[in-house]
Amino acid sequence: MTVKGLETHTPMMQQFLRIKAENPDTLLFYRMGDFYELFFDDAKRASQLLDITLTKRGSSNGQPIPMAGLPYHAVEGYLAKLVQQGVSVAICEQIGDPATSKGPVDRQVVRIVTPGTVSDEALLSERRDNLVAAIYQNSKGFGYATLDITSGRFMLSEPETEEAMQAELQRTSPAELLYPEDFTQMHIIEAIKGTRRRPVWEFDLDTARQQLTMQFGTRDLIGFGVEKTERGLSAAGCLLQYVKDTQRTALPHIRAITLDSKDHSVILDAATRRNLELTQNLSGGFDNTLASVLDHTATPMGSRLLKRWLHQPIRDTKQLNHRLDAIAAFKDTGMFIEVAEVLHHMGDLERILARLALRSARPRDLARMRSALQSLPQLADLLADIEQPRIGELAKYSAPMDELCELLERAIIENPPVIIRDGGVLAPGYNAELDEWRDLADGAKKFLDDLETREREQHGIDSLKVGFNQVHGFFIQISRGQSHLAPDHYVRRQTLKNAERYIIPELKEHEDKVLSSKSKALGLEKKLWEELFDQLLPHLERLQNAASALSELDVLANLAERADTLNYCRPELTDQTGIEIAAGRHPVVEQVLSEPFIANPTSLHHDRRMLIITGPNMGGKSTYMRQTALIALMAHVGSFVPAEAVKIGSLDRIFTRIGASDDLASGRSTFMVEMTETANILHNATSKSLVLMDEIGRGTSTYDGLSLAWASAEWLAEKISAMTLFATHYFELTELPSMMDGLANVHLDAVEHGDEIAFMHAVQEGAASKSYGLAVASLAGVPKAVIKRAKAKLTQLETTGHQQAIKNPSKAPREEQQLTLLPEPSDVEEALAKVNPDEMTPRQALDELYRLKALM
């Protein structure tokens, strides 16, 4: 619907269409009394998305106007549903007074709720960051900026390749993504729900610099270290303007922008984040992830920080040791228990402060802030007993703020209502004038009780009652049977079926006074509420620093608790390349097993750069590889790790090529996905990388797969010298350690008992003797007849060779042997190899010929 032809509509509908034209890409919630109404296509769309009734109102061009509505008091629930579906909503409120308005009451859009810019508690997942992001691209690479409006955290980066950009998108998982209308790499963002197409000019670099310096109150951006990041700044400028447009208010909590440099991080590509299941499992849930084991934080803001740490391990050994020292101090003193108990009272201070900055904080937000401030002295006392530099530094930032605490204690009642609209939030004694107006309003009940008693007794009307409603105000009600007793000065106001209602001058005078006092008390309370924000906002930076310190204290105390409870050890960080793990365990798998986890060692160093891992399917190869990567990652987060001892050098990247499935959306087969991930590793791994390669070459023919696996292993070992765990079912690869330096064979052990198999899950030196494939198939429930036939076919393949067995599928001996890719020599071939015809007599030669004939 356009704004053309407005004259054919009612004044109210004309107003709606004008406002809708200014907000074409959002659902417009148009306030009408106690409801938000939607019209035209918005109504149709909302009825489908929210499962609400679609009705009609008036007409347009002879056609009824579609309409849908929802009660204003239930709007949060509906907004939550829309935001989860990536839909933005413009909230249009009545700002004029209906009593004084000529025509439609004035309305305007007061805020735009979008998936990435919501700050309302009811619309957010408390333990996950909610980011709005912008992406930009030119010939040199990508620019990427993210903003968490609920904390003010503003970051930018400049990924150079498509793979790096995809990794950033997966790491940050934005709820909303802005992109320029000329963006060409749409396939990398199509999976994101809340994408927003923006004009190219919104990414203008000069405009971006101007926007950012204005926001931060600086002359330039040199102090933030982002002056030369032109691609990133283009994205950041568009992002900041979008947030300003949607919030319609100042953003004082966004005080800086930070360059997210990959030089200081252990880089994890998209496949690695997915395969290691850091915060999301392969099914898209949270269960059985690393975060599900490690996250026992006391506050939502601590939980979010821990997840950021897991997704961005760091290389700075000094910073890592600061974290490890703090965890050790909490663990050794046992203070993590008491600290966690105090932190539980802190709530989500970080997001409360964001709502304060946006002036959208609710009464219970400030009550929770008061509770947090009241807990700071107790926390300070606990931290004072721990002599550790990092904890001491954090304690300074989270020091008590007595003056702010006292202000909130004076201002807010103990249990305030949800919203300020109806008053009753500010405490008695906070403001003398407010107390006076409240006393006038509160005195109404006694006056009415006295009036009712007096009138009833004076006129002998026992059915007389004094009441009030919103339409008629105060009234005296007399039953129909006694209405003839009403005095002459009673003025009839309303007639009901069984009663009459009257007004008298004294009651009217009191009504005016009461309504006036209530109105003035409410108006004054709302004014004082806004002034309370003005008193708190100058302390915003200090409060944000405290929230940041409390978040880190929460994570460190939590990791100390996890280390103590789960028997983790402190990793030793060195400058030498290598990974030495004694009795390592998988942090997630050991928590879900009913029996004890079998711990295993890992040793990778200059003279042992690659482990060729063989063993039966289900024997634990993938678990062993993943646990090594997770232990390495946890060490680079600054956490204790599940092992008896760990010594690890600095890593630059962790790669995983584990498992694969079809990427139907991109038209890529399983094998194509596998080869793409392999190519990424071979191009980008270095001697400081940890590489996990699991079953390369499964998705193609046997010999193609073996060739690719062999060549990939050679390249990783010789050209890159990366620390590599290379699991394979190609036993031919176990020859590599005898042909090249720096490689070793290990295997996962298993024991067969007749037709049954027992997995030992223990890593042993040397190659596996067999694959146990048929035993695993039997364990999986494959029909016995199929297993029997497979054994026969296996024997034929071993005996006659691959091609001959295919040509004669029915001639299958029944002896059980182990399959290898390149068949071992047959008995005849081995016998012939030992024969020396020059040393044989004719009789011996004839006998040997008969013997060989018998072997066939």
UniProtKB/Swiss-Prot annotation:
The record's keywords, sorted A to Z, are: ATP-binding, DNA damage, DNA repair, DNA-binding, Nucleotide-binding
Q: Which residues bind ATP?
A: 615-622
Citing just one GO molecular function, the answer is: ATP-dependent DNA damage sensor activity
**Which PANTHER family does its entry note?**
DNA MISMATCH REPAIR PROTEIN MSH1, MITOCHONDRIAL, DNA MISMATCH REPAIR PROTEIN MUTS FAMILY MEMBER
> Which family does the UniProt entry place this protein in?
Belongs to the DNA mismatch repair MutS family.
**Pfam family of this protein, just one?**
MutS_II
Source organism of this protein record: Photobacterium profundum (strain SS9)
Q: Name one GO biological process term.
A: mismatch repair
- Enumerate the residue ranges of region (Disordered): 798-817
KW DNA repair (keyword) present: yes
Kindly give the PROSITE patterns that the UniProt entry links to this protein.
DNA_MISMATCH_REPAIR_2
Which residues lie in Polar residues bias regions?
Answer: 798-807
Q: Which Gene3D superfamilies match?
A: 1.10.1420.10, 6.10.140.430, DNA repair protein MutS, domain I (3.40.1170.10), MutS, connector domain (3.30.420.110), P-loop containing nucleotide triphosphate hydrolases (3.40.50.300)
* Protein name according to UniProt: DNA mismatch repair protein MutS
**Gene Ontology CC terms:** cytosol
Q: What does this protein do?
A: This protein is involved in the repair of mismatches in DNA. It is possible that it carries out the mismatch recognition step. This protein has a weak ATPase activity.
Q: InterPro entries given for it?
A: DNA_mismatch_repair_MutS, DNA_mismatch_repair_MutS-lik_N, DNA_mismatch_repair_MutS/MSH, DNA_mismatch_repair_MutS_C, DNA_mismatch_repair_MutS_clamp, DNA_mismatch_repair_MutS_core, DNA_mismatch_repair_MutS_N, DNA_mismatch_repair_MutS_sf
